[in-house]
């Protein structure tokens, strides 16, 4: 679920859920995302905020973060997925820090303002959060190649977060300038 498209697709497909009522029987149902497009929590906003659709029998609108695993449900019309993810997970989830918290760093004109120094792109906290989007190198394909110039540590230092379009892709994005680059070669240096 690390790719935006796979998270978005999770909202577009019908999900099969089961209710286990006893050891010998269970009931199942098919569910789709239950809320209308007038809600702030749409497939698009939830996916961008890091969530995929993960319903259960008791929580038909349950979502989970692809990175920290936080599960949220019972969405109301005015619930903002970015604000809620950042508020609940800013101390534990790299995606909440770098992507969802970014909205607090922009003023009405779209200019960046950093009232909190820890939110500066050059801060160690932000660099660590960006590195966390590469999932400790488990997802970033170039960390498995010794001496690769575009290792996850250098990518995070350069301001990139991992934003694969499909599983295994090496697309990384600078969220401050919206520059996405992929196809990293061994000799590339993101710095």
Language model regions located:
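Intrinsically disordered, low-complexity linker/tail regions enriched in polar/charged residues
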Residues: 1-191
């Amino acid at each position: 679920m690390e790719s935006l498209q796979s998270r978005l697709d999770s909202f577009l497909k019908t999900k099969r859920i089961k209710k286990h009522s006893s050891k010998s029987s269970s009931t199942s149902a098919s569910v789709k995302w239950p809320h209308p497009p007038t809600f702030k929590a749409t497939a698009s906003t939830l996916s961008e905020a890091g969530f995929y659709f993960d319903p259960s029998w008791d929580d038909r609108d349950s979502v989970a973060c692809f990175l920290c695993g936080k599960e949220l449900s019972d969405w109301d019309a005015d619930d903002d997925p970015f604000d809620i993810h950042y508020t609940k997970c800013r101390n534990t989830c790299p995606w909440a820090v770098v992507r969802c918290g970014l909205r607090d760093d922009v003023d009405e004109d779209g200019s960046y303002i950093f009232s909190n120094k820890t939110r500066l792109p050059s801060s160690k906290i932000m660099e660590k959060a960006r590195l966390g989007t590469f999932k400790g190198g488990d997802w970033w394909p170039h960390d498995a190649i010794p001496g690769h110039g575009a290792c996850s540590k250098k990518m995070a230092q350069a301001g990139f977060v991992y934003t694969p379009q499909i599983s295994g892709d090496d697309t990384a994005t600078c969220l401050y300038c919206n520059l996405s680059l992929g196809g990293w070669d061994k000799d590339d240096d993101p710095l």
